[in-house]
Amino acid sequence: MALSKVKLNDTFNKDQLLSTSKYTIQRSTGDNIDIPNYDVQKHLNKLCGMLLITEDANHKFTGLIGMLYAMSRLGREDTLKILKDAGYQVRANGVDVITHRQDVNGKEMKFEVLTLVSLTSEVQGNIEIESRKSYKKMLKEMGEVAPEYRHDSPDCGMIVLCVAALVITKLAAGDRSGLTAVIRRANNVLRNEMKRYKGLIPKDIANSFYEVFEKYPHYIDVFVHFGIAQSSTRGGSRVEGIFAGLFMNAYGAGQVMLRWGVLAKSVKNIMLGHASVQAEMEQVVEVYEYAQKLGGEAGFYHILNNPKASLLSLTQFPNFSSVVLGNAAGLGIMGEYRGTPRNQDLYDAAKAYAEQLKENGVINYSVLDLTTEELEAIKNQLNPKDNDVEL
């Protein structure tokens, strides 16, 4: 079956229908929620650090603390605006630092804690108690603890949020099937940080963020906007650079936008994502133009800013035992598909097109502005005749 016979889903009709809606939905975040301001950012960073230095730390609350830290970087005012713009009715709790007295082995001790409704003073005190035990052990081993190994290192909060950036890429599955991939990726990109902190346990921290995002979906909205703001801010630490790379990979792929609909145009995004998987090659341009119309916030950052990379992905899989046409953003990435194709006509058409590409090498490479290295890589992938490559 020819590609021209495989029609794009009725995305545009649905878009028109949604655009005519005169009403908005209001959601509730429940009871009072904690929205910290900039002034407690340092304390929240230290809380993250205490968890990181604690050997065999209990990360039950790490996801929550990480999100509170993210909100403190955005600031109270912007966090409230994000939630209200997303349709949430918010009753916000102000967060301050207070002194808390707690009995420790029969002795009363003082701790500086935050006035949080989501995390009791006792839990915060216990986090510090456990971290002190690990810190004493570090002092014995090292003699003096270097700044980058301490609980108050300024990048502790961002280290925790790097794991959140990995989790957010997997929420599209609707379950925790992506946990193994998150752990593997974290072990790779955060390997230096794991040498610094014995409490940096990717599996436990990832599960904590899964729990937070599943239980409090409004945190997804906050995290996406935080990620955009953080990634667009120049400068910063090495870990901030790692975070930006991880987050923009997730945002660019559009998976979170398309599946969860965390922004204003959410439903349109979901439809476009599912419809574009059924798109034929001749309609890729049509989908691309639709992406331009919606703008980067719709989850099309990757193809709008790097169409070359997306087009190159068409040629990356020379063996088409099975083919899926279209990626979430609608540019038609072709990759191997395991299992029975849901659309046999689409499968046959995509497979035929891919084999034709591989056999003939009829791609206008000149429009891709390839470097010498990229061109060589593509030639090796497709093994085209030299005169078939248009430079």
UniProtKB/Swiss-Prot annotation:
Post-translational modifications reported in the UniProt record: Tyrosine phosphorylation modulates viral transcription and replication.
Keyword NAD: no
GO annotation terms (biological process): symbiont-mediated suppression of host cytoplasmic pattern recognition receptor signaling pathway via inhibition of MAVS activity; symbiont-mediated suppression of host cytoplasmic pattern recognition receptor signaling pathway via inhibition of MDA-5 activity; symbiont-mediated suppression of host NF-kappaB cascade; symbiont-mediated suppression of host PKR/eIFalpha signaling; symbiont-mediated suppression of host type I interferon-mediated signaling pathway
Keyword Chaperone part of the UniProt annotation: no
Stretches for region Involved in RNA synthesis and encapsidation: 1-364
Keywords tagged on the record: Capsid protein, Helical capsid protein, Host cytoplasm, Host-virus interaction, Inhibition of host innate immune response by virus, Inhibition of host interferon signaling pathway by virus, Inhibition of host MAVS by virus, Inhibition of host MDA5 by virus, Inhibition of host NF-kappa-B by virus, Inhibition of host PKR by virus, Inhibition of host RLR pathway by virus, Interferon antiviral system evasion, Phosphoprotein, Ribonucleoprotein, RNA-binding, Viral immunoevasion, Viral nucleoprotein, Virion
Localization (cell): Virion; Host cytoplasm
GO molecular function, one term: RNA binding
Source superkingdom: Viruses
Residue span of region Interaction with the phosphoprotein: 244-290, 338-364
GO CC annotation: helical viral capsid; host cell cytoplasm; ribonucleoprotein complex; viral nucleocapsid
Modified residues (Phosphotyrosine): 38
Description of how the protein assembles with itself and partners: Homomultimerizes to form the nucleocapsid. Binds to viral genomic RNA. Interacts with the phosphoprotein P. When in a monomeric RNA-free form, interacts with the phosphoprotein (via N-terminus). Interacts with protein M2-1; this interaction allows the association of nucleocapsid with the matrix protein. Interacts with host EIF2AK2/PKR; this interaction inhibits EIF2AK2 phosphorylation of EIF2S1 and blocks EIF2AK2-mediated translation shutoff.
Record-stated family: Belongs to the paramyxoviruses nucleocapsid family.
Reported function: Encapsidates the viral RNA genome by forming a left-handed helical nucleocapsid that protects the RNA from nucleases. RNA replication depends on the availability of soluble nucleoprotein. The encapsidated genomic RNA is termed the NC and serves as template for transcription and replication. Together with the phosphoprotein, sequesters host NF-kappa-B in inclusion bodies (IBs) thereby inhibiting this host defense pathway. May also act as a modulator of the innate immune response by sequestration of host IFIH1/MDA5 and MAVS into IBs.
Protein name: Nucleoprotein
Organism this protein belongs to: Bovine respiratory syncytial virus (strain Rb94)
